[in-house]
């Protein structure tokens, strides 16, 4: 009887968690649908509604609006902050974008070291079926590797190895 009493609340908690994730996914998809139709303000609003729930896809969508100046004034610093939010929440394409931004200094201070780390982490976390995306990451990773000193490369490889064990980025990567 006691097991049933524990399982019931746990089951309800799981159901609640799954239902909120479905709402978040639906809001992102709603925003994406608007985005594809060129309804950028509506897309941004849907993503802003979803963002407090911690959805990485919505943070990426908001970043895109700032990066391209869609429904908001173009602001590469704000775009980089939103891409970083998506990256820290686990969105592989957010990780790739912040890596590219560090490579070119777009909205951030240029850093081949941070670019290399973020691009490498993006590759590690990219879906296996995203072959073109993963191949492009490898090209960019190799470009950044050539820009690093031996000491920077060694430090970067340690960060990547640590990430593989903990799935957490060091503090220095949590800020722009």
Task: State where each predicted segment sits.
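Alpha-helical segment of the N-proximal tetratricopeptide repeat
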Residues: 27-53
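Terminal, low-structured helical/coil segments at or just beyond the last alpha-helical repeat
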Residues: 132-176
């Amino acid at each position: 009887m006691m097991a049933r009493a524990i399982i019931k609340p746990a089951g309800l908690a799981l159901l609640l968690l799954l239902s909120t994730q479905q709402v978040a996914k639906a809001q992102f998809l709603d925003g994406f649908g608007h985005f594809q139709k060129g309804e950028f303000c509506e897309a941004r609003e849907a993503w802003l509604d979803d963002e407090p729930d911690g959805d990485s896809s919505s943070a990426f969508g908001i970043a895109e609006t700032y990066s391209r100046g869609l429904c908001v004034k173009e602001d590469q610093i704000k775009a980089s902050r939103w891409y970083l939010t998506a990256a820290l929440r686990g969105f592989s394409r957010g990780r790739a974008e912040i890596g590219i931004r560090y490579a070119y200094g777009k909205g951030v201070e240029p850093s081949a070291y941070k670019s290399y780390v973020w691009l490498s982490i993006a590759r590690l976390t990219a879906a296996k079926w995203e072959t073109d995306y993963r191949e492009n990451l490898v090209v960019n990773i190799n470009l950044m590797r050539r820009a690093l000193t031996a000491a920077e490369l060694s430090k970067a490889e340690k960060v990547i190895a640590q990430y593989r064990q903990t799935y957490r980025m060091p503090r220095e990567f949590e800020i722009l």
